[in-house]
Amino acid sequence: MFILEGYDSFVVFFIVACLVPILALSGSKLIRPKLSGIEKKMTYESGIEPMGEAWVQFNIRYYMFALIFVIFDVETLFLYPWAIVFKDLGITAFLETLIFLSILIIGLVYAWRKGALEWS
């Protein structure tokens, strides 16, 4: 028996999934109008002339809040399946989850003490 025998449909799906975006992007590039000018390189601001620079720097606090949100969002992602099958897992899985949660809580307390959650 060939070891990859059951993966035929996956390989076909993977090839099609790779070819569709490549063909769509290259096809649209081939049939697009080839016009260039200064208007094409200007930023679009609701049909009026652009005022000022288009480059805006965000404060680092936004990124800190986003990073902390992603961390705890991933925590929820891991805890939901565990909560569904909690009765079947036993005490070992419970202790592992307590260790996981304590590491995350220590990280939250560390970020809090460092002032990452303060907006001043």
UniProtKB/Swiss-Prot annotation:
GO terms for cellular component: chloroplast thylakoid membrane; NADH dehydrogenase complex. It is found in: Plastid, Chloroplast thylakoid membrane. It catalyses: a plastoquinone + NADH + (n+1) H(+)(in) = a plastoquinol + NAD(+) + n H(+)(out); a plastoquinone + NADPH + (n+1) H(+)(in) = a plastoquinol + NADP(+) + n H(+)(out). The chain crosses the membrane at residues 11-31, 65-85, 89-109. Keywords: Chloroplast, Membrane, NAD, NADP, Plastid, Plastoquinone, Quinone, Thylakoid, Translocase, Transmembrane, Transmembrane helix, Transport. It holds the Pfam family Oxidored_q4. Gene3D superfamilies: NADH:ubiquinone/plastoquinone oxidoreductase, chain 3. Its EC number is 7.1.1.-. One of its GO terms (molecular function) is NADH dehydrogenase (ubiquinone) activity. It is a multi-pass membrane protein. Belongs to the complex I subunit 3 family. PANTHER family: NADH-UBIQUINONE OXIDOREDUCTASE CHAIN 3. NDH shuttles electrons from NAD(P)H:plastoquinone, via FMN and iron-sulfur (Fe-S) centers, to quinones in the photosynthetic chain and possibly in a chloroplast respiratory chain. The immediate electron acceptor for the enzyme in this species is believed to be plastoquinone. Couples the redox reaction to proton translocation, and thus conserves the redox energy in a proton gradient. NDH is composed of at least 16 different subunits, 5 of which are encoded in the nucleus. This is NAD(P)H-quinone oxidoreductase subunit 3, chloroplastic. It comes from Mesostigma viride. The lineage of its organism: Eukaryota, Viridiplantae, Streptophyta, Mesostigmatophyceae, Mesostigmatales. The gene is ndhC.
